[in-house]
A protein has these predicted regions:
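Hydrophobic/aromatic residues within well-ordered alpha-helical segments
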Residues: 10, 53, 60, 64, ...
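Hydrophobic alpha-helical connector segments
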Residues: 59-62, 70-103, 150-157
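C-terminal peripheral helix-coil segments that are non-catalytic and often amphipathic
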Residues: 131-136, 140, 160, 167-196
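N-terminal intrinsically disordered/low-complexity leader segments
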Residues: 1-9, 195-196
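Helix-turn-helix
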Residues: 10-13, 17-59
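Amphipathic alpha-helical packing segments from all-alpha helical-bundle domains
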Residues: 74, 100-107, 117-142, 152, ...
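Solvent-exposed, amphipathic alpha-helical segments
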Residues: 13, 17-24, 70-71, 105, ...
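Short helix-capping/turn signature of helix-turn-helix
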Residues: 50, 108-115
Length: 196
């Protein structure tokens, strides 16, 4: 009897190969052929899971969001609102080699979004989810905050997180990133101490 291949495991292996191609050669090098070669499978085998380049890129972006979501959900909630928010936000920026590689790929996929509707939808969804997350974290710190002020500070925090992530991904590998925690903590403390 032929061996059944676990489709989810195969999909993850192929996306990992895609990430490798993007990380080493850039998103312009992505094709079914280059990803199949990186994964050590035939193009036909790859097409059974991902029929098009767009399907491959979209799946990679979705997996990246799933990975970040999993890390955020793993943050213990039994801590102060400030500590919890800090830990959650630090999972959204590249603070180690794995999250740096992931962010580099994320930036490449965002750049490709203008040419791919699937990536554009995912980019917009991720942006909206990040805003909502920032808003929930700030509301947790100050449950009595004025709605308009909360919206304003949520946009600001969203920009800080995006800018911090983009800045960190450009730092040289091995450079200390401890200062990133201070940026996040200072932003959250300023919100905690502010009056409406």
């Amino acid at each position: 009897m032929p061996r059944r291949i676990d489709r989810a495991a195969r999909k993850a292996e192929l996306v990992e190969a895609l990430w490798s191609v993007i990380h080493h050669h850039g998103v312009s090098a992505v094709s079914l052929r280059t990803v199949a070669a990186a994964a050590g499978v035939s193009v036909g085998s790859l097409r059974h899971v991902f029929p098009t380049r767009s399907a491959l890129l979209t799946s990679a972006a979705e997996l990246m969001i799933d990975n970040v979501t999993r890390r955020v959900r793993a943050v213990p909630t039994d801590q102060s609102a400030l500590a919890y928010a800090t830990e959650v936000l630090l999972h959204l920026v590249p603070t180690d080699s794995a999250s740096r590689a992931e962010m580099e790929i994320n930036v490449a996929l965002i750049a490709e979004a203008g040419a791919d509707r699937g990536l554009l939808r995912i980019r917009d969804r991720a942006r909206n989810e990040l805003y909502r997350l920032c808003r929930r974290l700030l509301a947790r710190i100050r449950p009595d905050a004025d709605e308009e002020r909360l919206d304003e500070r949520s946009r600001r925090l969203h920009v800080v997180v995006d800018g911090l992530a983009f800045h960190l991904v450009q730092e040289r590998p091995g450079t200390s990133r401890r200062w990133a925690r201070s940026v996040v903590e200072e932003e959250l403390r300023a919100w905690s101490a502010s009056a409406d």
